[in-house]
Amino acid sequence: MTLIEGVGDEVTVLFSVLACLLVLALAWVSTHTAEGGDPLPQPSGTPTPSQPSAAMAATDSMRGEAPGAETPSLRHRGQAAQPEPSTGFTATPPAPDSPQEPLVLRLKFLNDSEQVARAWPHDTIGSLKRTQFPGREQQVRLIYQGQLLGDDTQTLGSLHLPPNCVLHCHVSTRVGPPNPPCPPGSEPGPSGLEIGSLLLPLLLLLLLLLWYCQIQYRPFFPLTATLGLAGFTLLLSLLAFAMYRP
């Protein structure tokens, strides 16, 4: 059953919504017009034309004061602006770093020959080796007061070397690093599968199989075959004895 006879409910709802929107729009327009029509209030701080005499009187009184006189407010501001005298000691600027001088090092070899080298405190042990022994830095060992200088990244300044100090230098003849020795009681393992160690057990197994066939099937083995088998057995026994002899 429809709300209005002859008119669908959808049309009725649409016109109702449009009517509500129209009423709201008219109400908003009327409110905006009423707010825009109100006169702006005049600020209270703005001087009115009726007060020129008071302003002129105040200006004349300020001009009549002595030029050297200061108001209490200005005097207070001047005192606040003056810096307070410091009571502590004045900070002295840090002295500039003294320039570093190069180190003079005496490299002493095993044959009592010496070589003078100059280096900076920030240079490392590795850079000293590369400079004095180019291409042989891996073969050079430096010793200072019985201590091996093995850390190539250590700087010379961290060692606190005195002037004209002596560094004992040992030059090795080997190019590569030596292989670490095997601990006692241990032997190096085989690098891979050794076929020679398996050949002799296979031959022994084959020899046992032939002797088994010779005993079980004697008619098939003539005298020459038996003698050949015996000679092969003797040869294989001598070979096994030579290989496994302590």
Curated annotation (Swiss-Prot):
GO terms for biological process: ERAD pathway. Residues 40-50 have a biased composition (Pro residues). Pfam families: ubiquitin. Gene3D superfamilies: Phosphatidylinositol 3-kinase Catalytic Subunit, Chain A, domain 1. The modification Phosphothreonine is found at residues 71, 92. It comes from the Eukaryota. GO terms for cellular component: centrosome; nucleolus; postsynaptic membrane; recycling endosome. Residues 2-30 are annotated as: Required to release iHOPS from membranes. The chain crosses the membrane at residues 11-31, 195-215, 221-241. This is Transmembrane and ubiquitin-like domain-containing protein 1.
